[in-house]
Amino acid sequence: MLFIVRRPKPIREAPCKYLIAGGLMFIAYEASISLSIGLATTNAQSVEVSLVNYLWPTLLVLMTAAVSRKHGAVVKAIPGAIVATIGVAMAVGGESLSVQEAVSNIDSNPLPFALALAGAFIWAIYATFTPSLSEGYDGTTIFFCCVAVVLWTIHFASGDGLPATAPGIGGYAALLACAISISGGYACWGYGMLHGNMETLAIGSYATPLFSTASSTLLLGVALGMPFWIGVALVVAGSLINLWFARRS
């Protein structure tokens, strides 16, 4: 699908250091996130692992501030980052989020949380530093092909084969819809990284977990509770704080 949405330039035009560094980070991120969700043993752990993964917008905001070379940029980014991160936790975790239960789950099953945290750092580093290595080349499509190979290899190496029964028309339709949304999202993100303002893009990335949670609840037919809307308000407030400080800098 990405070859349709974002056909890459000939690979010979890509800087070697970008292909190696960017490709390894992209694959590592996708693999770590996929494995972290797969290794979660309960619904509560899945939510908590997602929350750890959604630290990447905060890390991205702080990293882009750090490399901007603006005086006091990191310190000025912290207040908005804290407010927005609390908002993300409320929006994604909702009323079911329990700090005590989360600590217990981390203690009993630390690997998925470690993978999710590693993924958050990897993606923030990838988004911050690969644009300067790319020289305008967008390797998202190539990287995703490599991700597919790695994930299928992990799948078969774990002993799982192909599904016993083929999905119906509804399953294929859902698969196509997911492919379109994911490929479109990554294509837009890759274009924004190369041609947009990274500080603004980083701040805007706080909307990612909100849209993800909202779409999930709508697909499952679950009503969005008050914690979600409070979280949205906090994310908006934190983003505006970051934008205000960024423009003043």
Where are these regions (language model features)?
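Specific transmembrane alpha-helical segments of multi-pass solute transporters/efflux pumps
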Residues: 7-46, 90, 178-196
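Cytoplasmic-side transmembrane-helix entry/capping segments in multi-pass membrane proteins
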Residues: 14-23, 72-85, 135-145, 200-203
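Hydrophobic transmembrane alpha-helices of multi-pass small-molecule transport proteins
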Residues: 21, 26, 73-96, 206, ...
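Specific alpha-helical transmembrane segments that line the substrate/conduction pathway
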Residues: 35-71, 198-217
